[in-house]
Amino acid sequence: MLSVKKVLCIVRAATRLGITHFRLTGGEPLLHPQLDEMVSQIKMLPGVSSVSLTTNAVLLAQHTKRLKEAGIDSINVSLDTIDASEYECITQKPLLKDVEDGIEAAIECGIRVKINAVLTPQTDVVALTRYAAKKGTDIRFIEMMPVGEGHTNGVEPYEKVIGALSEVYGEPCCVNTENRKEIKLEHKNPDYGPAEYYIFPGFGIRVGLIQAIHGKFCDSCNRIRVTADGRLMPCLGSDVTMDLLPDSCDFTDDLTDDLEKDSVIAQALKAAIKAKPKCHNFSDEEVLQPESVMYNTNKNNESENAVTYKKTTEIKTTEIKAVDVNAARNMSRIGG
């Protein structure tokens, strides 16, 4: 697991390239013993505009006050159902009440909350949206990626979400085409993300769709990801990973100049951005066949989501084997 010191080095290097928005995800970030300190330290760095968190919210209620004091800007809660029995079936633990308490605690603390729900054929879109509206939080429905169960359990997001909600609440407002209910430019996502947002009559919240397959947004994707062990993934749907913290970056040596460390990491980030492919390769069955898909959520959160792929392409920072795929465009859209 990355130390706070290493995380801060990565963030400092990223800000040098113009990257200003940072999100802590997982696994489960609330398990990190120094999460509050990490958020606070990141927020104090020059060039950082926002720090957000994505969590299953099981432990959120006990963390909200400290996160608020640390300066967290927003929290996304992963919640695929509000039915207690179905939640227990999905997670193997009866912890829906803990999640709801966490959401309520965050809202009471004045933290902006959004709900993320992964779509399956069983997803009760109307119930989840009603719950979000009651809480005053935006909700985003995320298309399941074709990994593991996603190969056979996915659904077409637009028809599943917009179709179901339209039957109950009428056509969404803020549309600009006759054939497809796309929101107007001024209602596009202000959160620098891939979601398309829709507004339904009588709702004071936005309903978002994130469609990696049916609404491919690769040409505007501005995300790169760092794993808990310091590897960098330019794209979730690619077999390319990069060594972000090479041996030349000695974090045990306090005498090593931070600027020198930042410079090495910044070069790795540049290489990763240049290596970001034009589009994902989820259609490549050979590349994305998981050897194992393990998931478990428990009260102590001792386990976390893990997917191991059969094929990966490792790019060492010291080798700088970046694939120059429209590098100028990538640097521009990500911040450099």
Can you say where each PLM-predicted feature lies in the sequence?
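Well-ordered beta-strand scaffold positions
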Residues: 27, 58, 203-205, 231
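Radical SAM enzyme [4Fe-4S]-AdoMet core and its adjacent flexible, acidic
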Residues: 80, 85-88, 93-208, 212, ...
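Radical SAM enzyme core and accessory elements
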Residues: 215-336
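Electropositive phosphate-/nucleotide-binding environments in soluble metabolic enzymes
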Residues: 4, 96, 155, 259, ...
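Radical SAM/AdoMet-radical enzyme domain recognition
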Residues: 1-24, 28-142
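Flexible, glycine-rich phosphate/dinucleotide-binding loops
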Residues: 60, 122, 148, 216, ...
